[in-house]
């Protein structure tokens, strides 16, 4: 998770901080230490832990006592490398680094922050002072306060004495000189110095929808710690841990430390094998100064009594939030000043915690002052652990848990409800992954996780159901959506439950298989004529259908997403739709087709053109009773300047119409997505129009006044997230689809290179003879140009796709003069079916040459195998990669990595190639599978990797099959259906 960088505030603590206010010190390490962009290894793997790094003048002083203290303390400090492997509650899956220190050497207990241990699944290891490492498991994370315990086996540390630090919260004093010794900014060991300036600071606010500590004082000092120092011990000159580093202001040198009073109590419970009880009345208190308490109604005599009782006291605890339906609801109100509990005067949060933790299920008497009046209220203390979720559900690609006390407190709502911690798959909601509350699904209320589970068991796969939901940031606005239940791609329907004995989360499958999809019945629908003056064009709306693709798996470098565009029905009798590969990038998708915004039916990908950027989708026409029509297609190509009618669908999927003209027709070379190459359309005669509506619409058509379709209007993916809208002439593609009339799939032949146009001037410079230039000038009636080759693809065997080379200028193909790509297309169109090469006459190095150029079949361009391993999505290098790269290091290409997975933790790297595993070659996916089957659970393997830029490096990776099992997706060559195979590793 990126660091939350706050604005510096000058007001007192009674004002909540900005959302970008403070940063928990390890939060930015997912980017800086295990970045999916940088793919850099951490400094800790490369630098000597024995060389202490002193980062301030005070730390480098020659005080022998401090030097001795530091030498002792560093033996207890460990660097924690960890992954939070799944979204849960307030936390997102991530890989990061932090600090911890040993508090019990005999039992092997490490103290660190709660936001490091996390509320959800945790995997990590600790690196000690001498570079020994051992696995750690979480044994406790506090529901509220920012501390948790990790456990390791002391016997695993063989070459150094395991030392512990004693906790002495009583030694934290204003003015006390301290050292923060930890993993600051990812450095292996940094020593930061400072002086304690406050003991009574309210907890920092890290923002909404994230973990925040509360109901405790924090210690403040200026130590300039940063990311990675979370969990560092704050020690005094005598070597005692007086506090725990927790957070800080990233715009100043201010740091915040957690007092270790309650930490010490929890540690004693663990050491004595006793439960760590945590009580609550669901009230948040704030420490407010006496001047504010007076304004809230505190009487002078009460202030005097409290000051005399506690001379060092500067304020009182004042209620800030009382949760509805909690134990104190209706009894304690905002602004009440706390005086005593069970007759014992209260001056600090520590005493409140002590009383609540020891009175769970018991009634306590709370004395408060409200508006100058003394009041005594009685309420029963609840169990804080019972309102802290320890389970999550995975279904339909999303994950859920019961609403936690943490989030309920942030928004002052009852601690109940179904919370979505990862809204994806069937439940993708506005690209916001968390913060959602589901009120009902399929018209059935879902007040909690258990109810939701029972509801989901009775919903069939592929069923459409209604969803009512809200976002925590705007609970006043109820939202409504129709969702399609996906239990086939996202087949997991299991409950994960925390197991504090093993440190793992145990998975329970809740249903063997979903209910069968509901049977579809034919339906009718009404069309409304287009708002256009030409009668022949009004009914073209009957030739449009909305194509909705759901991409469940990041394949071919396309991340999972949903896309919707309108396609043109090219054969209503057989149910074929012409649409864009922007919407249908590959065939590992779910397709639905919507007719007239009324009928929704499943579709299927039947053809993907490897270069021209279009796809053919098929639906069952027997399910549609509406009068869908096949439009008339023109057999004459468009010309520049020709008047046409543009009918398009904008981003809101509303139809727009404009009379315009063709402004240009040219071969457009789209930019390649540099960060992760993916499919891009090439070698198309792109049609541009003289209308601003063109770039506002991602789908549509161009027609004449007689209603004849002249061109398809499509969206094309470019670099980054840019989308380009252009037309493609029907005469350039309809001949390729003649197979469909006979019920056959197109198996076309293409030249797998990218062509571009060059001017006569450039042609002369490159050596094209004048006689050929004269021929070009004589033939051209629109643009004076020739075709050249800027890029050549390679095949999986690392050979060039054909005999052409970069920079070749094309003169003729099969003795036909070439001035545009359409000329090459026509030559291929007229070839006999058994011909697989054509004759090119080219200019290369200012020499005219004749070449035999081989053609490629379209069947060579689709992906048919995917492997999941340790969170990495691996496949053979797809066509988008082979269009760009010069040489393939391996046939195992990483196209995506899961957050929090070993692949991201150990930085396999997206766009990288795995060439060897444990020194065994992995030239393809099948060989890779053979090798990894021998790697046992929780064991390390060595991986040799080559980057996209051909830079080799080696990496080690520790497998984790419990959270990230190995599986394979295979496409059946006959049925074209995908199936998943689980791969079992050796035990």
Task: Name the predicted role of every residue range.
Residues 2-45, 68, 101, 105-106, ...:
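C-terminal recognition in membrane/secretory proteostasis and scaffolding
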Residues 123, 251-261, 449-452, 590, ...:
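A short, polar/charged loop-to-alpha-helix boundary motif
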Residues 153-165, 190-253, 257, 317-320, ...:
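Active-site region of chymotrypsin-like
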Residues 60, 64, 169-172, 190, ...:
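Soluble non-cytosolic domains of exported or imported proteins
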Residues 53-56, 85-87, 93-95, 104-190, ...:
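Conserved active-site neighborhood of the chymotrypsin/trypsin-like protease fold
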Residues 72-87, 180, 538-555, 646:
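A short, Trp-centered hydrophobic/proline-enriched beta-strand micro-motif
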Residues 80, 122-130, 178-183, 363-369, ...:
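Short conserved beta-strand and strand-loop elements enriched in small hydrophobics
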Residues 81, 127, 181, 237, ...:
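Residue-level recognition of conserved beta-strand edge/terminus positions
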């Amino acid at each position: 998770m990126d660091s939350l960088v706050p604005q510096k505030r000058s007001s007192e603590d009674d004002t909540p901080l900005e959302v970008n206010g403070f940063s928990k010190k390890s939060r930015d390490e997912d980017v800086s230490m295990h970045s999916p962009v940088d793919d850099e290894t951490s400094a800790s793997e490369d630098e000597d832990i024995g060389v202490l790094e002193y980062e301030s003048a005070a730390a480098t002083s020659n005080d022998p006592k401090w030097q001795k203290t530091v030498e002792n303390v560093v033996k207890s400090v460990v660097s924690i490398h960890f992954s939070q492997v799944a979204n849960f509650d307030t936390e997102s899956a991530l890989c990061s680094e932090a600090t911890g220190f040993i508090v019990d050497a005999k039992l092997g207990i490490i103290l660190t922050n709660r936001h490091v241990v996390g509320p959800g699944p945790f995997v990590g290891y600790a690196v000690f002072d001498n570079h020994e490492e051992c696995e750690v498991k979480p044994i406790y994370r506090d529901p509220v306060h920012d501390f948790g315990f990790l456990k390791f086996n002391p016997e695993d540390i063989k070459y150094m004495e395991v030392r512990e630090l004693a906790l002495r919260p009583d030694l934290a004093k204003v003015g006390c000189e301290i050292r923060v010794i930890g993993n600051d900014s990812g450095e292996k060991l940094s020593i930061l110095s400072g002086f304690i300036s406050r003991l009574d600071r309210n907890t920092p606010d890290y923002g909404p929808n994230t973990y925040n500590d509360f109901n405790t004082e924090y210690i403040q000092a200026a130590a300039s710690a940063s990311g990675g120092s979370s969990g560092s011990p704050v020690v005094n000159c005598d070597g005692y841990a007086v506090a725990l580093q927790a957070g800080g202001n990233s715009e100043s040198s201010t740091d915040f430390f957690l007092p270790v009073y309650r930490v010490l109590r929890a540690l004693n419970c663990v050491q004595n094998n006793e439960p760590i009880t945590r009580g609550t009345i669901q009230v948040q208190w704030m420490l407010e100064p006496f001047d504010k308490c007076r304004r809230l109604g505190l009487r002078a005599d009460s202030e005097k009594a409290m000051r005399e009782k506690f001379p060092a006291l500067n304020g009182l605890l004042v209620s800030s939030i009382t949760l509805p339906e909690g134990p104190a609801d209706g009894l304690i109100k905002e602004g009440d000043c706390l005086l005593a509990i069970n007759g014992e005067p209260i001056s600090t949060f520590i005493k409140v915690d002590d009383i609540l933790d020891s009175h769970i299920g018991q009634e306590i008497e709370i004395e408060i002052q409200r508006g100058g009046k003394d009041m005594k209220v009685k309420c029963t203390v609840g169990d804080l652990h019972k309102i802290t979720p320890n389970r999550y559900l995975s279904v339909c690609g999303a994950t859920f848990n019961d609403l936690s006390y943490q989030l309920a407190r942030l928004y002052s709502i009852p601690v109940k409800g179904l919370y979505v911690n990862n809204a994806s798959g069937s439940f993708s909601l506005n690209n916001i992954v968390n913060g959602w509350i589901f009120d009902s699904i399929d018209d059935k209320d879902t007040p909690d996780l258990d109810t939701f589970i029972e509801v989901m068991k009775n919903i069939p796969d592929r069923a459409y159901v209604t969803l009512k939901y809200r976002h925590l940031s705007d609970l006043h606005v109820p939202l409504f959506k129709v969702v399609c239940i996906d239990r086939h791609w996202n087949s997991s329907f299991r409950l994960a439950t925390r197991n504090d004995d093993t440190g793992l989360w145990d998975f329970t499958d809740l249903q063997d298989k979903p209910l069968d999809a509901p049977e579809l019945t034919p339906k009718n629908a009404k069309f409304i004529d287009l708002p256009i003056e030409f009668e022949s064009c009004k009914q073209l709306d009957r030739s449009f259908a909305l194509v909705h693709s759901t991409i469940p798996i990041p394949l071919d470098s396309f991340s999972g997403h949903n896309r919707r565009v309108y396609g043109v029905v090219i054969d209503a009798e057989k149910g074929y739709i012409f649409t864009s590969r922007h919407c249908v990038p590959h065939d590992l998708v779910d397709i639905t087709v919507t007719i007239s915004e009324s009928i929704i039916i499943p579709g299927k990908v039947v053809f993907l053109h490897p270069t021209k950027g279009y796809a053919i989708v098929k639906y069952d026409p027997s399910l549609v009773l509406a009068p869908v029509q096949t439009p008339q297609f023109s057999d004459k190509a468009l010309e520049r300047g020709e008047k046409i009618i543009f009918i398009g669908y904008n981003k809101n999927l509303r139809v727009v119409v404009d009379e315009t003209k063709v402004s240009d027709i040219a071969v457009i070379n789209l930019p390649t997505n540099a960060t992760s190459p993916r499919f891009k359309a090439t070698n198309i005669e792109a049609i541009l129009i003289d209308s601003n509506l063109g770039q506002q619409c991602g789908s549509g058509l161009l027609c004449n006044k007689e209603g004849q379709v002249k061109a398809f209007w499509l969206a094309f993916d470019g670099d980054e997230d840019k989308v380009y809208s252009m037309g493609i002439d029907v005469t350039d593609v309809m001949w390729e689809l003649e197979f469909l009339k006979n019920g056959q799939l197109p198996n076309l032949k293409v030249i797998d290179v990218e062509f571009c146009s060059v001017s006569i001037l450039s042609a002369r410079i490159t050596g094209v003879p004048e006689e050929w230039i004269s021929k070009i000038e004589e033939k051209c009636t629109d643009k004076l140009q020739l075709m050249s080759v800027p890029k050549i693809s390679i095949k999986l065997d690392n050979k060039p796709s054909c005999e052409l080379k970069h920079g070749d200028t094309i003169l003729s193909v099969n003795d036909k003069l070439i001035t545009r790509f359409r000329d090459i297309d026509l030559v291929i169109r007229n070839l006999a079916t058994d011909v697989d090469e054509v004759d090119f006459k080219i200019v290369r190095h200012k020499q005219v040459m004749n070449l035999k150029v081989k053609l490629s079949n379209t069947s060579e361009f689709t992906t048919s195998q995917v492997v999941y391993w340790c969170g990495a999505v691996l496949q053979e290098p797809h066509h988008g990669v082979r269009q760009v790269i010069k040489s393939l290091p391996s046939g195992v290409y990483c196209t995506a990595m899961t957050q929090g997975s070993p692949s991201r933790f150990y930085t396999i790297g997206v766009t990288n190639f795995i060439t060897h595993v444990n020194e065994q070659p992995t030239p393809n996916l099948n060989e890779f599978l053979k090798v990894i089957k021998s790697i046992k659970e929780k064991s390390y393997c060595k991986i040799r990797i080559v980057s996209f830029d051909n830079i080799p490096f080696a990496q080690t990776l520790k497998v984790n099959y419990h959270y990230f099992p190995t599986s394979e997706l295979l496409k059946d060559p006959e049925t074209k259906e995908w199936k998943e195979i689980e791969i079992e590793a050796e035990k």
